[in-house]
Amino acid sequence: MKQFFLGFLFVAAAAVSSFAQGSQPKLEAVPKVELDRYLGKWYEIAKYPNKFQKQCVGNTTATYSQKQNGRLELLNECLKKDGTMEAAKGEAKIADKQTNSKLKVRFAPGFISFLPFVWANYWVIDLAPDYSYAVIGEPGRDYFWILAREPEMDDATYQQILRRAESMGFSPGRVEKTPQGVETIRGGVLNRT
């Protein structure tokens, strides 16, 4: 039930944000995503803080796999302060089949998937030619993630991504790095492993 509520909050907020785009320039997704290359495990390098990830303190990953119905399964995992892992399973469908760079994602239960508001925009707005990193955003600029195939990213690449994101209307000052390779110890203090 908790996963449903968190997923519902994400979808509802993303739906509201699409109405509040105002004077932002039109957001463009990358021209093409090869889904076979996009599948697999991604490490969250950084993000805009959001309510549905507030329990996460590090080791956040997203793993994509192909489903038989042509959609993608999304498994998000993160480490919580108490040392346990939290997992949320979602589904993604391709919103733009010519480019594969615009997805609709839901974490709500399948029996309400017919409701449009449970599907949130999830656009690939920057992508390394070798698929070593991907940047995700949505037209309202309320959500933003930097993902990579490795748990660490060199600072030069990270800064270049932030500069490109800023030119698209995202705010680098809101971006928060995600710790990877951490564990919890007594008192909720984090250590790198």
Which role does the model predict for each range below?
Residues 7, 16-193:
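A beta-rich soluble binding module of mature secreted/lumenal proteins
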Residues 1-4:
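Positively charged n-region of N-terminal signal peptides that target proteins for export
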